[in-house]
C-alpha cells in the first residue's frame, strides 16, 4: 500500500512537472509568435507607400500601381483619390503622404517653396528636386446618353446657357476642372455667378462627381476631362482649345515629409516607364515624361 501510494505520488509530481514545462513552452511559443507577428507588421508598414492623386487618375494610376506592386514584392500602395484642392489641404494639415500628383500646377505650386508662382510662403511640403510634369489631359464637353438638349459644342453650350435652355455641370472653384471651366466661361464672356443664381449651373466637389451628374443625366451637359469621359464611356461633343482654358498639365512629386522617401522616388521613376505610360494612354492621357 505504501509502495502504491509512493508510485502514485511520484506519477503526480511527474505529471505536474510535465504540465508546467508544457505550459512554459506554450507561453514562450506564444510570445515568439507575437514577436514574429509584430516584426512582420513592422515590415509591412515599412513598405507601405501613400499616394495622394487627382480623382481623374483613379482608374489609370490604380492599374499602374498594381504593376509596380507586382514588380516590387512586399510593397503596398495606399491611394487617396480626390480633388487636388482637397488633397492639398490634407497635406497642409499634416496627413501622411509620400507622393502627390495634382491635376493642376496651382495646387502643387502652393505647397512648393521653390515654385515661381502661386506659392504660399508659409507652406513648404514638396521635395522640389523630385518634381516633374507627368501627364497632359484635355478638357471636354460631354452630354448624357441621346443628348436630350442637342448640345453640339462649346459654342452651342454658351448660346444655350445664355438663353437659359440648359443646366451645366462643372467643378467647384477650388477644383482644377472647375478652374478650367471658369476660364471657358470667361472666354465666352458668360457671368458664372449670374448663371448659378438663375439655376443654370450645378457644381461638383471633384471631376468624378461632375462625371456622375452627366452619366445620370441630372445635367444637360458637363465639362470634364477627356480621361474621365473615356473611362465612363460618355459622349464627348467638343474639346477645349489651349486658347480657351490653357494646357491641362499634371505635376508629380514626393513630399518633404515622406516616410518612404526612397520608395516614393522609385515609384515616380516607374511612372515614366512604358508600362505605366500604357495605363495612362489607354484612357486618353498624354505622358510628358518617359524613362
Per-segment meaning from a language model:
Residues 74-75, 97:
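Short, well-ordered coil loops that connect the C-terminus of an alpha-helix to the N-terminus
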Amino acid at each position: 500500500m505504501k509502495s502504491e501510494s509512493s508510485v502514485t505520488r511520484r506519477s503526480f509530481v511527474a505529471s505536474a512537472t510535465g504540465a508546467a514545462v508544457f505550459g512554459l513552452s506554450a507561453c514562450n511559443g506564444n510570445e515568439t509568435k507575437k514577436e514574429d507577428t509584430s516584426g512582420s507588421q513592422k515590415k509591412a508598414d515599412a513598405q507601405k507607400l501613400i499616394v495622394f492623386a487627382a480623382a481623374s487618375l483613379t482608374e489609370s494610376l490604380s492599374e499602374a500601381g498594381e504593376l509596380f506592386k507586382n514588380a516590387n514584392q512586399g510593397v503596398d500602395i495606399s491611394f487617396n483619390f480626390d480633388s487636388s484642392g482637397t488633397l492639398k489641404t490634407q497635406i497642409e494639415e499634416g496627413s501622411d503622404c509620400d507622393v502627390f500628383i495634382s491635376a493642376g500646377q496651382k495646387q502643387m505650386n502652393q505647397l512648393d517653396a521653390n515654385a515661381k508662382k502661386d506659392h504660399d510662403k508659409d507652406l513648404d511640403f514638396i521635395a522640389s528636386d523630385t518634381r516633374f510634369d507627368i501627364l497632359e489631359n484635355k478638357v471636354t464637353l460631354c452630354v448624357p446618353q441621346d443628348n436630350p438638349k442637342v448640345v453640339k459644342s462649346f459654342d452651342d453650350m454658351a448660346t444655350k446657357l445664355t438663353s437659359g435652355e440648359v443646366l451645366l455641370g462643372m467643378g467647384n472653384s477650388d477644383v482644377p476642372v472647375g478652374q478650367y471651366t471658369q476660364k471657358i466661361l470667361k472666354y465666352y464672356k458668360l457671368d458664372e455667378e449670374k448663371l448659378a443664381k438663375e439655376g443654370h449651373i450645378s457644381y461638383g466637389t471633384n471631376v468624378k462627381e461632375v462625371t456622375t451628374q452627366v452619366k445620370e443625366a441630372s445635367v444637360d451637359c458637363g465639362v470634364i476631362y477627356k480621361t474621365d469621359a473615356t473611362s465612363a464611356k460618355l459622349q464627348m461633343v467638343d474639346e477645349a482649345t489651349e486658347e480657351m482654358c490653357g494646357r491641362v498639365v499634371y505635376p508629380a512629386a514626393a513630399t518633404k515629409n515622406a516616410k518612404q522617401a526612397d520608395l516614393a522616388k522609385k515609384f515616380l521613376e516607374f511612372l515614366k516607364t512604358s508600362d505605366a505610360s500604357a495605363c495612362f494612354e489607354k484612357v486618353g492621357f498624354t505622358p510628358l515624361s518617359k524613362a
